[in-house]
Amino acid sequence: MALTDLTIHELQALLKNREISSRELTQAFLTRIADTDQRIGAFITQSEEAALKNAEAADARLAAGNAASLTGIPLALKDIFITEGMRTTCASRILDNFVPPYSGTAVRKLQEQDAVILGKLNMDEFAMGSSNENSAFGTVKNPWNQDCVPGGSSGGSAACVAARQAVATLGTDTGGSIRQPASHCGVVGLKPTYGRVSRYGVIAYASSLDQVGPLTRDVEDCALMLGAVAGYDPADSTSINTPVPDYQAALKQGIQGLKIGLPKEYFIEGLDTDIRQTIDKAIATLRKLGAEPVEVSLPHTEYAVACYYLIATAEASSNLARYDGVRYGERVDQGRGLIDMYMQSRAAGFGPEVKRRIMLGTYALSSGYYDAYYLKAQKVRTLIRQDFLDAFNQVDVILTPVAPTPAFRMGEKTADPLQMYLSDIFTIPVNLAGTCGMSVPCGFSHDGLPIGLQLIGRPFGEETILRTAYAYEQATDWHRHCAPL
């Protein structure tokens, strides 16, 4: 088995025992990127020289016997994370030349453990998209079928792991942007509870919804990565000051007697046949492992997409007001005055989907429509959160599909934004509720595309969904399948 096929927990032992060096491991991944990324397009910026230098520093720490859990492990980051000295674009022309003077908290935590950062990954521009077709740096291709999308907005993060270009990656999830691409690319992806991981140093899309999370080969790596980045951060006012559990220790507790909720609103007519059959088989497997499936109701699910696209776009219109060509980013200097320069810089710098969402959000916040749209959406959000809290009075975990279909073909939905928005119908409610959810590989469609199982936990219930996912993963081998690159 190639080094690039191994997980973090497998590589830890090899590094600790000095059977391999971090430099050797890092070079193997850099070679893999060189061999595959012309076909996939997962990377926006590679950091080969710095990665090899950091790998040598990690080797010194390993030799001294004081390694941390990620020392010497090659990782990659969605290009939404601020990284000191490394270009950060958010897949937008307007930030094409932006090199930040500092690193965000999640990145710094990885660096403090001597993880090796290979580079920055492609995404939908400003995390706005469900297919990774909205990047100024080209479309990412699904490693399982390069005619299909990898999902979005963390499409590069999922494709990178599936293509064995890094051991694991960090992404962000605002309405499904970790879980949906994880499902489409056949990897594990977890969106933590809002406030569990610091957002400091993450370029904001929708501040009340954005959350940082890992994408990995298997559940154990996911638990390890979450533990590495989770925790209170005084630099983020939304960070929650609660202890971080030992997520790895919780994995092997089993799921005997665990009640798993099946929301009737998610298992409806029109759900793709392959998705339905695969999810039904996963439910049967969990039942054999001792879990008890229970039907529950999340009655306000049907309003989630409309609610999300009012709240998220309203927050985006405010967050993206800072990109004016003056303080950082691209500037168009042909304007006839300051206001004209603002307008031309933003017109040239933002892509069409970002412009669409800024306009939607500005409209929702306008004085004549604030109460009718934005305020009403916030009230619906409260109802959706209460639906989940009520359901968790009956069950320990909620199980649903991640997406209504497997990965779709490139260009299939670009002409119909509403159809694209509906791709996230099963993931958006988790963000609105502020709770945690993850995608675990659970099978393939009839044409060989991966399918993910979504496990949703109560707020700060990451331990429970991780041990449920681990029990399922140990009973199956879906996570061992490799994309045919």
Swiss-Prot record:
Class of this enzyme: ligase
Gene3D superfamilies, A to Z: Amidase signature (AS) domain (3.90.1300.10)
Assigned EC number: 6.3.5.7
Keywords, comma-separated and alphabetical: ATP-binding, Ligase, Nucleotide-binding, Protein biosynthesis
Family annotation (SUPFAM superfamilies): Amidase signature (AS) enzymes
Reaction(s) this enzyme catalyzes, per UniProt: L-glutamyl-tRNA(Gln) + L-glutamine + ATP + H2O = L-glutaminyl-tRNA(Gln) + L-glutamate + ADP + phosphate + H(+)
Active-site residues, as the UniProt record annotates them: 78, 153, 177
HAMAP family (alphabetical): GatA
PANTHER family per the UniProt record, alphabetical: GLUTAMYL-TRNA(GLN) AMIDOTRANSFERASE SUBUNIT A, TRANSAMIDASE
Family assignment from sequence similarity: Belongs to the amidase family. GatA subfamily.
Function: Allows the formation of correctly charged Gln-tRNA(Gln) through the transamidation of misacylated Glu-tRNA(Gln) in organisms which lack glutaminyl-tRNA synthetase. The reaction takes place in the presence of glutamine and ATP through an activated gamma-phospho-Glu-tRNA(Gln).
Record protein name field: Glutamyl-tRNA(Gln) amidotransferase subunit A
Organism the protein comes from: Syntrophotalea carbinolica (strain DSM 2380 / NBRC 103641 / GraBd1) (Pelobacter carbinolicus)
